[in-house]
């Protein structure tokens, strides 16, 4: 989520000055998204999207699944990181927000690598499992409605190959997960997933305090 970080503004500016590789096309999409109602709260921070691209290269991912497209900034970053023959399936409940990012995918020359699925994510994931079978993806990125996180995680774990990676965004959720008084459904859902991940022996995990928290879960072989 945009600007959701524990770093001071000065330290964030410094980190970006020495490590962020956001070109003009990405910046244009980032700025356009920030102008949307709720856009700054919903869009991924650029350094986190860059990190996802690095993960794709580190894992050697050729088949990537993204649950939650929004305006497609992270989609673009991940598509650019794919090797020859790679492909990303990204799904969203509506074509309203992905429609903003699609022209940027075209301008970047990666639109042919992106398979956008519109509709309920639970149904899309079921269709992918039926069509492609379990273990069809090398990396899955989860960044959708928090109420569905438990279901998305279980589906992602089935769809990712042994040794593959599931990356889950917003696992610190504006700090509300650490507030016992925060009992809204979204916070409870994220907190419940975090508890499950801690004890899940099917995966190796690390929760990184990048942006709003991103948990990496490697499916054990």
From Swiss-Prot:
A Pfam family of this chain: Methyltransf_3
GO MF term list: metal ion binding; O-methyltransferase activity; S-adenosylmethionine-dependent methyltransferase activity
Keywords in alphabetical order: Antibiotic biosynthesis, Metal-binding, Methyltransferase, S-adenosyl-L-methionine, Transferase
A single BP term in Gene Ontology: methylation
EC number: 2.1.1.-
SUPFAM superfamilies in the cross-refs: S-adenosyl-L-methionine-dependent methyltransferases
Binding site for a divalent metal cation: 143, 169-170
Binding site for S-adenosyl-L-methionine: 44, 66, 68-69, 74, 92-93, 121, 145
Protein family: Belongs to the class I-like SAM-binding methyltransferase superfamily. Cation-dependent O-methyltransferase family.
Function: 4-O-methyltransferase for the lactone ring of midecamycin and other macrolide antibiotics.
Protein name according to UniProt: O-methyltransferase MdmC
Organism: Streptomyces mycarofaciens
């Amino acid at each position: 989520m945009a600007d959701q970080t524990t770093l001071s503004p000065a330290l964030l500016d410094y980190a970006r000055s020495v490590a962020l590789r956001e070109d003009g096309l990405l910046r244009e999409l980032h700025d356009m998204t920030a102008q949307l109602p709720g856009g700054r709260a919903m869009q991924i921070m650029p350094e986190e999207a860059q990190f996802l691209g690095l993960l794709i290269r580190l894992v050697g991912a050729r088949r990537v699944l993204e649950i939650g497209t929004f305006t497609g900034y992270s989609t673009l970053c991940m598509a650019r990181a794919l090797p020859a023959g790679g492909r990303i399936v990204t799904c969203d409940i509506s074509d309203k927000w992905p429609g903003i990012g699609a022209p940027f995918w075209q301008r970047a020359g990666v639109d042919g690598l992106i398979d956008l699925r519109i509709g309920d994510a639970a149904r899309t994931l079921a269709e992918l499992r039926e069509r492609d079978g379990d273990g069809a993806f090398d990396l899955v990125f989860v960044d959708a409605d928090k109420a569905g996180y438990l279901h998305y995680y279980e589906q992602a774990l089935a769809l990712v190959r042994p040794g593959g990676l599931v990356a889950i965004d917003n696992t610190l959720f504006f700090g509300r997960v650490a507030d016992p008084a925060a009992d809204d459904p979204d916070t409870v859902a994220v907190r419940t997933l975090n508890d499950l991940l801690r004890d899940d022996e099917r995966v190796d995990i690390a929760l990184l305090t990048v942006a709003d928290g991103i948990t990496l879960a490697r499916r054990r072989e």
